[in-house]
């Protein structure tokens, strides 16, 4: 899909935090594998993936990729992430940010110059930011907002929707970049305004889920017309 190519091209970055979110079965692992594949094609990078389970095997091309499976090669995401940081990777893929320790370590890894990819089961960019902040106790939340505003490069939220011919599903992507206005909203605890920014920033490559669904419908790719509650901004 064109959207997937746009995501691949934009997020082969050098550092920062890129989150891919959505419900179970929405294709998050496929999107992450595509991003790692892009890096493998273009960068002489050391990549460590931490997965539960490993779904896609990556061969070495330009990048050196070490894949580790939670439960087989390591006890937990938090333990695996701490161990990975001692190996001086350029890129770390964390299959899922499940708990405070993993989230905190992933943010720290992004702060210290690594490119970190991970997933959450949230729907929508604003809900993703809120979920991360809410994991932390109240006295830490403002500091986490500041850290997250610095390191966040993107939130890609996706859904799989039945196609017009009812023979398959098509991916719809909400895309939020870590622009200065977005970073300011995160820092100021105004995530409720993110949906408004997404609706007016398409020239910057951002799009709300409602608009993404409408685009698919207008291109005759959806079986039914999208309702506002189909999107992540409702």
Regions found by a protein language model. Give the residues of each.
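Short, flexible helix-loop junctions that flank or precede catalytic/ligand sites
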Residues: 1-4, 8-225, 229
């Amino acid at each position: 899909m064109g959207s997937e190519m746009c995501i691949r091209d934009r997020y082969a970055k050098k550092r920062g935090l890129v989150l891919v979110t959505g419900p179970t079965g929405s294709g998050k692992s496929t999107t992450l594998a595509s991003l790692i594949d892009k890096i493998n094609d273009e960068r002489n990078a050391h990549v460590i993936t931490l997965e539960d389970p490993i779904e896609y095997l990556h061969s070495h091309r330009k990048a050196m990729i070490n894949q580790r499976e939670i439960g087989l090669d390591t006890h937990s995401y938090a333990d695996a992430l701490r161990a990975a940081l001692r190996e001086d990777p350029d890129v770390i893929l964390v299959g899922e940010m499940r708990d405070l320790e993993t989230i905190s370590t992933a943010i720290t890894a992004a702060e210290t110059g690594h490119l970190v990819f991970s997933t959450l089961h949230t729907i929508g960019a604003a809900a993703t930011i809120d979920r991360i902040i809410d994991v932390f106790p109240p006295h830490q939340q403002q500091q986490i907002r500041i850290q997250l505003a610095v390191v966040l490069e993107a939130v890609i939220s996706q859904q799989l929707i039945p196609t017009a011919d009812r023979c398959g599903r098509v991916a719809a992507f909400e895309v939020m970049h870590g622009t200065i206005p977005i970073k300011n909203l995160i820092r100021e605890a105004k995530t409720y305004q993110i949906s408004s920014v997404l609706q007016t920033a398409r020239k910057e490559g951002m799009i709300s889920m409602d608009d993404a669904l409408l685009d698919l419908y207008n291109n005759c790719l959806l079986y039914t017309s999208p309702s506002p509650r189909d999107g992540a901004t409702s």
